[in-house]
Every structure is written in structure tokens, then in C-alpha cells.
């Protein structure tokens, strides 16, 4: 069994600072409520058959006014329909979509979370001090298109994989680690929540937990285990994954951190100069996320 890596105290301190600075975070019981319902069964990867342990959606309510009127959420939401979700199908980025990407980056760069992130990265010499340079760097890391399948045209980017989700060869869900996309897709009845994945030594997560492992189907495909932050702002996730991506040139970077009461492993896969995937794992969970 792989030895658990030591806690990264420097990143834990920084990420808690970002958590506290995240004024756009939705709070459980105030800005949203969820219904965990039953514990999901084990489903092998690649299977599209799963017992539904949750007859109702995960999200009972979300403050839609706040979603629409908070700039980082509204600009983020406008990006979610810009992608062809099947890998192997080439993406075409229109001038309007490029403008939407830039509006989103401008919105997140105006937040305290991303200002603190930029300061940290400059101090580490992983980003340039000029904001325009930093924005260009973020654009390349997150929005530059690349190919996930050999011999096919550019069909993916880090943003699409992590925040929107993709399907592979019509039978497997890749990515989709974002609560806003989950909620919006659930509302459209494209996502069917199947139940929570229990953490070891804790038979059931709490409905105010802001990190969950869960099982769901999307457009007919099953995700056996998906790890997801609930309620955090787009800029918070963007910051965490960018920091860990820029730390290392390794194919996979894993950092064990403690954020609030959550002991997590933040995992970032690199696709050359770009983000391949990124997600949190609850370390007390029985199952690692199937990315």
C-alpha cells in the first residue's frame, strides 16, 4: 500500500487563507441545501449500471439570485455550454467564446482569492508580477486546446475537463468536478445523483460538508466516484489547482493539505504545458476518485 505523504503545512496555511478570503463561497443552510440520501454501491470503472440509492436530486435549493448576480459565477456559468463534451470531437473556439473566457479571467483576477494567489506565485517566481502576463499564463494553462485522443484534432482543455466534464468513447465520464455545473446539469435532468460514497470511520457525511465523494450518472454514463467541493467559488478552485500545477513539472502532482476540517489530497494531472485534470480527494474516503 502506498505510504501517505506528509501534510504540506505551507500550502495548508495558504489554502486556509484563500478559504477565509473566499467571500463568494456559498454557505450550507444559507445559500444552498443538499440531500445526501443513501450510500452508493460499488460500481466498477467503465460500468454504466448502478443502483440508485437517491431518489431525489442532491441539491434541494441554491440561491439562484446570488449565482446570477455574482460576477465570477455568472461569467463562469456562461462558459459551461461552450464545449463539445465528447472526446475525439474537435473543439472550435469562436471569438465570442474567447471573449467569454477573458471576461471570466478578468472577474476572478479582481477577487482577493486570486490577488493572494498571484502574490504567492510571484514570490515563488512561478508567475510574473504584471497582471496581463499572469492572465495570459492562466489562459494558456486552462483554455489552450489539446488532443486527448491520438490522431484526433484538439478536443479538450483543462477548464472543460475539470469544470464542465467530458465523455470518453460514449461510455465513461471524465472530469466534472464542479458543484455549479453539477447543480445546473441536475436541474436540466442530465445528471442523476446516485448517492454518497462513505468516508472510512464515518458512516455518513454531513449535509453541511463542503467536500463530498459521490456517485452519479451524466447523459447515461456513470461516474462511480467523483470528488467535489460544494459551495466554493470558481476562483477558489481555480487558485488551488493553478498553484499545484505550477509547483511541479511532474505528470501527476499530489499534495496533502488540511483546509478547515477537511484533510484532502489535491491531485493535478499535467498534459504538457496545460492542466489535464484536477480534483480533491477526501483522504478518509474508501475510494480514490476515478479521474
Protein language model regions, located:
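N-terminal "domain-start" segment
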Residues: 1-257
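Compact beta-sheet-dominated globular domain cores
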Residues: 234-291
Amino acid at each position: 500500500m502506498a505510504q501517505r505523504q506528509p501534510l504540506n503545512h505551507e500550502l495548508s496555511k495558504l489554502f486556509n487563507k484563500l478559504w477565509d478570503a473566499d467571500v463568494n463561497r456559498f454557505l450550507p443552510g444559507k445559500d444552498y441545501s443538499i440531500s445526501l440520501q443513501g450510500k452508493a454501491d460499488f460500481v466498477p470503472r467503465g460500468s454504466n449500471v448502478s443502483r440508485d440509492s437517491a431518489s431525489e436530486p442532491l441539491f434541494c435549493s441554491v440561491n439562484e439570485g446570488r449565482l446570477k448576480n455574482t460576477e465570477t459565477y455568472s461569467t463562469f456559468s456562461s462558459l459551461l455550454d461552450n464545449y463539445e463534451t465528447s472526446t475525439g470531437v474537435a473543439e472550435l473556439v469562436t471569438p465570442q467564446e474567447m471573449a467569454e473566457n477573458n471576461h471570466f479571467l478578468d472577474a476572478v483576477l479582481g477577487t482577493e482569492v486570486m490577488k493572494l494567489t498571484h502574490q504567492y506565485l510571484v514570490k515563488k517566481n512561478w508567475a510574473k508580477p504584471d497582471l496581463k502576463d499572469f492572465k495570459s499564463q492562466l489562459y494558456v494553462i486552462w483554455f489552450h486546446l489539446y488532443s486527448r485522443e491520438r490522431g484526433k484534432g484538439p478536443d479538450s482543455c483543462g477548464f472543460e475537463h475539470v469544470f464542465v466534464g467530458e465523455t470518453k468513447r460514449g461510455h465513461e465520464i471524465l472530469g466534472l468536478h464542479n458543484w455549479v455545473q453539477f447543480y445546473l446539469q441536475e436541474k436540466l435532468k442530465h445528471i442523476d445523483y446516485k448517492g454518497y460514497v462513505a468516508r472510512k470511520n464515518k458512516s455518513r457525511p454531513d449535509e453541511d460538508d463542503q467536500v463530498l465523494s459521490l456517485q452519479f450518472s451524466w447523459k447515461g454514463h456513470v461516474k462511480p466516484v467523483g470528488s467535489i467541493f460544494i459551495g466554493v467559488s470558481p476562483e477558489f478552485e481555480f487558485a488551488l489547482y493553478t498553484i499545484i500545477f505550477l509547483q511541479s513539472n511532474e505528470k501527476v502532482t499530489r499534495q496533502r493539505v488540511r483546509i478547515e476540517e477537511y484533510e484532502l489530497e489535491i491531485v493535478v494531472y499535467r498534459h504538457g504545458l496545460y492542466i489535464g485534470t484536477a480534483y480533491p480527494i477526501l483522504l478518509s474516503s474508501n475510494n480514490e476518485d476515478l479521474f
